[in-house]
């Protein structure tokens, strides 16, 4: 199995409507932008929606995940859909949102979530700055 650090720098090839697209794992700024969009798109209720267990809210979270990732990492998809600059993907109709969400869940989410899990594990394995009685910065 490849080292996850190497996987983070590799280009993933995905296909949307017959067009192959290259995507790299988000850098720190992009990761934060994705998470900020999730918060904005959910009106600050992303965690509540995710934890609710309500089918419609779980679907809404899936839509939010898809749109947030596409907005930040796959601007080519926006261009293919002729979404005007400055307009959010959240303004697309429900049929297109469903298509984008299904595509994201099939081609992006397994890869992205797997690498995020590996980052969490690696981060949790590292000692805190204060574990050894070090001074606060």
Describe each model-derived feature in a short phrase.
Residues 1-5:
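Short, basic/low-complexity N-terminal boundary segments at the transition from targeting/disordered tails
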Residues 6-13, 19-137:
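Short, surface-exposed, charged amphipathic helix/loop patches that serve as local interaction elements
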């Amino acid at each position: 199995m490849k080292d996850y650090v190497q996987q983070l720098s590799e280009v993933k090839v995905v296909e949307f409507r017959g067009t192959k697209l290259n995507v790299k794992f988000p850098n720190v700024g992009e990761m934060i932008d994705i998470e900020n969009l999730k918060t904005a798109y959910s009106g600050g209720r992303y965690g509540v929606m995710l934890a609710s267990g309500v089918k419609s809210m779980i679907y809404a979270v899936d839509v939010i995940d898809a749109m947030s990732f596409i907005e930040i990492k796959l601007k080519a998809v926006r261009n293919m859909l002729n979404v005007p600059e400055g307009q959010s993907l959240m303004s697309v109709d429900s049929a297109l949102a469903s298509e984008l969400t299904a595509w994201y869940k099939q081609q992006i989410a397994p890869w992205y979530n797997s690498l995020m899990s590996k980052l969490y594990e690696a981060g949790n394995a590292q000692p805190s700055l204060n574990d050894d009685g070090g001074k606060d910065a």
